[in-house]
């Protein structure tokens, strides 16, 4: 009955939702038909000036003569990377002129009836060749995108004469970013710049089929077939771009050098600029040609001789200035180049005079802004500045010191560990009276409060126990051991927020904790085998979450950060039950090792017991009583005799009777 009750509402729901489903299906069909229409399928988002995406829709073809449009020309859809607003890989061609050439292998040279060319550019020149595609030597076919008198156009020759399609309405040498699209299908061609009007070219006269039909009527029958074949061959020669061999970009080989930037070149499926950036062996680059995003050798990232925590990374972000970025407790930022266009002019300004760009930044002018993305890696603590960042629970380490070691540590920049402040440590700075142990560890979160819920993923370590580097008795901590917020002097390292962003804690200890030590390196204890036992809670102890990193005011820095060997092997504390604050004891590690040993012994004993039980069972099975076996055999014999065939039993009885009869007859004869 339960399935029937569940099924009934489901059927009712389907009946209720059927109009919605029909409406949704109809809407999808109408939307797909609408988007596939010629006027709306060609919506393009052009990669306009830096940071601006221009959305536009291509207008309809003006129908001049229906006969000239026998085969539609698919020119309105530019490559996907340009439709989505991504400019693509960008190369800058300098004032001296440069050339980027691609050569097809001899056995891979294509011949095409339809060509598609799309490229983004910005320049201030009035004359220059952007791109030229040439056929093999001796054929003479070519296709050239060039600027003449500030107007951009395409000239191509596929066997007859030079055919030019030009955008004559507006000049493009305004230093702004433009996207030009050209498509050829046979002798038909179209050219469009940005969202401007489409420029078209169609051959004069009727179509090839009509001309062939007219010629066949006037040609004798015996010559009709050879003439038709000749015309078809001639027509193919006049519509096919034969044996394309090279693509040259820059125009310096034709004495018409291009100066500016080219982005996202697409030609018949080839992304030549992308291939050049990837180091394609068929591409050669000569002259003043540079990939946007390449950092010159003189301005490459370099690091000073300071410690890694305070290293200053210099990154050249523009060609007119270099930016110095100082990062504390961070690895050098990652530099990644992108294909996004970052400027629309050759200079950093919109000035069209290229000569004025040469004197900036010591001769590094005349270039574009580098598209540099600086990703800040995960902040690393000072304890392990060169190790992978692995989030661990917070850690507090108590280090035993003497007065001599305290004075040496203070001179080296390590904060004081005793209660006496600067009097015991020998520090002359009056502002350091309350300095305690500066602790750096892993963790995240706000000020420690067990009543507050965790605020991020790492705050699940809400409580933890402390582990000492030396063997200290639990009774040592019965005194007034407390952790308190630091009091920072004017020359000390300071966090921006003591309990929030910096999360730096100081701990002052009583003189009872100052004990002599004979080793400078703490013992290496396994991080995963500590502090699994419960301890009595100490109500006098207040613990704060320890910092992962803190910002250092470099104008007030008086000593290096704490990266001495005494902090290298900091054991990791494992959190215990929430809400209980605990103090470490010397018996923690001992009891942990004994429990581990007991566990191993128990496992071995259990295995031995199982083996003994198995051996005993096998022994009992092999030495069972033999009498039972004989009894079973006898019963089987009786059972088999009882189940035997009646005919066999009869034969046996007859043979027995005949034997007895013969014996009697023999006895008779003997007596007679």
UniProtKB/Swiss-Prot annotation:
The keyword Cytoplasm does not apply. Coiled coil: none annotated. The chain crosses the membrane at residues 598-618. Residues 421-436 have a biased composition (Acidic residues). Processed by alpha-secretase leading to the formation of an extracellular soluble protein as well as a C-terminal membrane-embedded fragment (CTF). Proteolysis of these CTFs by gamma-secretase releases intracellular domains (ICDs) and extracellular peptides. It is found in: Membrane. Residues 89-289 form the Laminin G-like domain. Residues 502-522 have a biased composition (Polar residues). Residues 1-35 form the signal peptide. PROSITE patterns: LAM_G_DOMAIN. Residues 319-340, 417-454, 495-532, 640-672 are annotated as: Disordered. It is a single-pass type I membrane protein. Gene3D superfamilies: 2.60.120.200. This is Neurexin-3a-beta. It comes from Danio rerio.
